[in-house]
């Protein structure tokens, strides 16, 4: 098992957050491989789900279409709807603004919003050769009713073994928790 663990935190339901004029609703979700399970349905289930929660800002991890509908067969690049189609998709749930963060593979993060978005920085590489930010990151600025909000998007390395480790060495790398160490490296680089 790998991942981040936080001890001594109590989580309590405080009830539903109202739609007051000073509240900002943010939805941050990993939609897994560009939501390939809803592609054949024109993303109608996804749009209905987002509308149900009516967020002001959304951040979507893995926001590129990479597989054919509901399969693990690669989608031809020319047939991929996302990430280029985010403006059209976001408009269906009421978001007029979109921005795709830095990405170097098939797993970008996309931010959509009811408010203007400015991309401050797209991040794909770090200051160490051979150690990129595996799925990219971005620093985005959203202006909400005259207030500036900076949002950092990051989708860390997901494997138990370290980034770039060959298949013959992956078990040993996982045993040494190199995947966790790589995630820590990515987070520290982004936050520095």
Regions found by a protein language model. Give the residues of each.
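N-terminal, active-site-proximal structural segment of metallo-dependent hydrolase catalytic domains
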Residues: 15-91, 103-106, 187
């Amino acid at each position: 098992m790998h991942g981040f663990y936080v001890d001594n935190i109590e989580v309590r339901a405080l009830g539903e957050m109202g739609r007051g004029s000073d509240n900002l609703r943010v939805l941050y979700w990993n939609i897994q491989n560009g939501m390939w399970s809803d592609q054949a349905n024109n993303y109608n289930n996804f749009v209905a789900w987002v509308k149900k929660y009516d967020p002001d800002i959304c951040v979507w991890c893995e926001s590129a279409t990479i597989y054919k509908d509901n399969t693990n067969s690669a989608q031809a690049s020319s047939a991929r709807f996302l990430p280029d189609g985010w403006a059209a998709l976001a408009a269906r749930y009421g978001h007029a603004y979109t921005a795709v963060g830095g990405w170097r593979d098939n797993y970008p993060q996309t931010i959509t919003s009811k408010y203007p978005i400015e991309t401050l920085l797209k991040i794909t590489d770090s200051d160490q050769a051979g150690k990129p930010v595996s799925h990219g990151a971005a620093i985005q600025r959203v202006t909400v009713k005259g207030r500036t909000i900076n949002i950092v998007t990051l989708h860390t390395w997901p494997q138990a073994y370290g980034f770039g480790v060959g298949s013959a060495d992956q078990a040993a790398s996982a045993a040494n928790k190199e995947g966790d160490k790589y995630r820590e490296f990515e987070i520290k680089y982004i936050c520095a």
